[in-house]
Amino acid sequence: MSPLTSSLLLFSLLTSSLEAIPVLQPSFPPSSPSPAPSPGVRILRAPESIVAPLGDEVVFECETSLQPEGFEWSYRRWPNAANSNGSVGASRFKYLKSGNGKLNVTQETAISRLRVLVRPDTVGEYRCIGWFGPLVVTSTTARLELANTSVKGRQETHLQWRVAPGNSVLWSCGQQVHSNPSASWSYYRNGVEIKPELAATNGNLFLTNVSTASAGKYTCLATNPASGARIEISSSMVLEVLSGRGSQNKAPHLLSGQPTSQAVTIREGSTLLLLCPGVGSPTPTAVWSSPDVVEAIHNKRTRVLNHGLEISNVQGHDTGTYICYLDNGVRPTLEHFINVTVEVPPRITRPPWADLTNEGERMQLECEATGVPAPELYWLLNGESSINDTEAEQLPNGYLVLHSVQKRHAGYVQCFARNRLGEQSAGTLLQVNPKQIQSEPRETGSGGGFGSHRSMKPVNHGQKPTKMIPPSPPNVTRLSDESVMLRWHVPRNDGLLILFFKVQYRMISEGKRKNWQTTNDNIPYGKPKWNSELGKSFTASVTDLKPQRTYRFRILAVYSNNDNKESNTSAKFYLQPGAALEPMPVPELLEIEEYSETAVVLHWRLDSDADEHLITGYYAYYRPSSSAGEYYKATIEGAHARSFQIATLEAATIYEFKLQSFSAVSASEFSALKQGRTQRPKASTTEEPTIQGIGDRDTTTPSHNETFSMSPMLTGTIGGGALLLILLVSAFLCMCRRRSPRGRGQTQNKPRMAELREDFVPLGSCSPNKQRQRTRHIHITLNPLAQQQQQQLDEKNPPGLETDNDMAYFQRQPTYEYDPGLRRMSSSSLRRSQRTLERAGGANSGGNNGGNNNNLNQSSEAGTADGPCMQSSSKPGRVIMKRPRLSSRSENLSSGSLNSVGV
């Protein structure tokens, strides 16, 4: 027997939260409704009760929705197991061993067959048990009973009736017979078998519209359909039919031996025939009514017959009193009361449901059922009776209380409701969150891969041990034929920070033990913030697996101290091909709501005919629409969820989303892709960021890059620097403007300062570029016209008046080489100017005693005395001088040609 499928449900049991599900079908009639299908593993076909004679061989069949690791059968003796009402006794079930000559167990994929030889010591109750790892699913009980037929007492009745023709006669032949299964009846008239018009039950013979041909002696015979045993009833009835001429008018009345009332018990779904005994002359007519049952007579299931009422597909609400009135016009009328009881197999109306429970907490599981007779409830915890569990107590209303939940309770919890008509079961997965045991510093790891190395951290003697809280065992869900999805969580703790996770898995085979394989991806822990009271949840997928193989998985956590610790391993998981699984409902994405700059809300729905019981939760996949990378994943627990918020997104970014539903066994197809975007960032009115509370809505622009969040500060720094630079430049320009000549605009004879400043800089300002300084001699040729103009100005400005300090300049060192052609042009212009001045001087030499000496070859002493004031610089080749002013544009041009500089 291959352990393939069994692992599938085992894993789901311990880590997956499912709604309560009906596990198997009770032995209802075919017409009765069956429980809705359930996710995961369930009993598709439970063994059925059998009545057989001694020495016969019977076969019990049990089928599960998935192939388990193994089947087992349990048994307890029937006489001690239940009383006549079918209530459960204290006798315990025992597991059967095949091959002892009395029974044999065979298995074919997901079907198990138990062959039993009917003997007194094999009569009793049988159960089928499917093992899926630590998960146990138990079927309802099937009974093996001996076929028997017996007669209650030996009282014989011999009746003689005389009736008028046209009446109907009811004879109860088999009131004293008890048969298992119910006997079939044969009727004889004068030793010849007859076929009654109406197939009455319980040995009742009903003769309608009798005539003289109906007269004779009637007898009956009971046959056991299982064993074939026949019992001839010694009672008889002799019928005499009067002629029409000899009959007298008589009111309706009962014949001798006929009861005045009846009590009828029938099973739900059967056909009920009510007969109204009584004869009269003339023939009476039957009228039916019921004070208890609404519309008991006038409905589609009821048919009124001559002296009878037939109700098909009897329901529980047909229970009540029916009254038959016989009237033939002769008073008084005859009333006949029939009390009808409809027995209903048990139905669980409130199945148990369990959530994740912490170890040591108290838990109450509720289960309610209906049925006639009232069903009795009992519980199984992973196939074991709750009566044998010291922590379990069943309340009078049938609820189960676990005073202290233990790890052994994790698994499948089933509630059973039973009466003499059958059983029904519903179960739920119980998850137990174990108490966290603080880990001591360890020297070696266990297993392979990351967990097998020796910790290199030194031992801190006398200090509190380092706490490394491991993650929970992963919950496995099938995604495809080659991939699964793992879900796990880290409980709230104050231990070491987890940096990232690794996923490890290994294949389980019957041969050599396989080593653990480690995936390449690091699953980041993220921000050290708890998402809920239970801790923080994570999701990861594992691909490149092989279908029809069994695997185990575990999660490896790497901590901030560079050590690691692995979780407990998952249950064995059988990766079943998708073709063998029931398809899951596919959700339909309706809308992607823009919730904030960092979050959106998904809205979806299921088809109207989709069964939510198949769903454990949903997987949401999302990524930026401009990206072709991997999808981010989010897990949504609960089948009833119809919306979910996804946060930590980028502002003003378009994303694409898709959904799929999942259960403990498989996942659905993906929904159609739908795009949505986050809100645009809001305009900020202040340079300082606003600190928000925990409950405030996040309106900041999120980013996965921490440096991007500092961009407002960086922008402010750059802006402030630019503003400061502008202020400095403005101040410099303002100072330069203030140092411009104060007399600008007062006379047209002032030289243009912009042109002069191209060659000179003010005294006291920054010195010329020192990097390009070099020693050179500068020869300045004075403008003769300027000397004459300067003499005139000196006459207007007597000595003693202060001169304008702004007119003092020193000449810049030239940064270019003069063109020799320009130098020759300047020399020729100078010579023409000298000749002109000489002519003018010769003509006016006698009359101009105070004229300036325009001889350019004058000595340096004369030039120092009469010319502009000149100051030698400490550096060679530099001359500080007061520049003569030009009186006109032509003079400026002449000055420009005469002020040639030779180096």
Swiss-Prot record:
Cellular localisation: Membrane
Residue numbers on the Cytoplasmic membrane side: 734-903
Membrane topology summary: Single-pass type I membrane protein
A cellular-component GO term for this protein: membrane
Membrane-traversing stretches: 713-733
Keyword terms, alphabetized: Disulfide bond, Glycoprotein, Heparin-binding, Immunoglobulin domain, Membrane, Proteoglycan, Repeat, Signal, Transmembrane, Transmembrane helix
Biased composition (Polar residues): 427-439, 676-689
Pfam families: fn3, Ig_2, Ig_3
GO biological process, one term: cell-cell adhesion
Domain spans labelled Fibronectin type-III: 470-578, 586-681
UniProt record similarity statement: Belongs to the immunoglobulin superfamily. IHOG family.
Protein name stated in the entry: Interference hedgehog
Native source species: Drosophila pseudoobscura pseudoobscura (Fruit fly)
